[in-house]
């Protein structure tokens, strides 16, 4: 519960996602018409949850790709594509390669990362730190939970910036 609190509470104000403390500009969310989530392992499963959240809430198409396959599939990326890289450590080699490809091809990039100053955090346009602390469980339950929360916050911000939900829907 503490990890979820640390991820969510500083970023919700009056029912709206607020990334100002993270220095994440609303501009990254403007005009997004497609989201690609890339990750490995547990983080990939959090991406699947995020896909359902975004598609159900705001009807933007989302694909979730294993980072190990992303760079080999020749993805179509442009300035209207938001690539979300999810990683606990911020150092996963395949996720870093996927991020670099997204950056090279002009996509907007944001990472959901636990470890401050990691390679993926440094190379992303923006980073949403989960502040989860070290993972004790082998099953990576804490990391999964906060990564899902991060995806929910991104969904809320996409909805708000692109006027895809009413204020009442946002507060629900």
Where are these regions (language model features)?
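A short, well-structured juxtamembrane/interface segment
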Residues: 12-31
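Flexible inter-domain linker/hinge segments
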Residues: 1-12, 17, 172
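Glycine-rich phosphate-binding loops that contact phosphosugars or nucleotide phosphates
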Residues: 30-171
């Amino acid at each position: 519960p503490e990890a979820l609190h640390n991820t969510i509470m500083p970023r919700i104000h009056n029912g709206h996602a607020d990334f100002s403390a993270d220095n994440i500009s609303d501009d990254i969310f403007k005009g997004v018409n497609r989201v690609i989530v890339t990750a490995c392992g547990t983080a990939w499963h959090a991406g699947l949850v995020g896909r359902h959240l975004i598609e159900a809430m705001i009807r933007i198409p989302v694909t979730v790709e294993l980072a190990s396959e992303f760079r080999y599939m020749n993805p179509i990326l442009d300035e209207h594509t938001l690539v979300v890289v999810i990683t606990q450590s911020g150092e996963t080699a395949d996720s870093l390669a996927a991020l670099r490809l997204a950056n090279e091809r002009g996509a907007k990039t944001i990472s959901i990362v636990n470890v401050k100053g990691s390679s993926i955090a440094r190379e992303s346009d923006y980073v949403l730190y989960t502040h989860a602390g070290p993972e004790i469980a082998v099953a990576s339950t804490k990391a999964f939970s906060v990564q899902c929360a991060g995806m929910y916050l991104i969904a809320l911000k996409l909805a708000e910036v692109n006027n895809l939900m009413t204020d009442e829907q946002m507060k629900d």
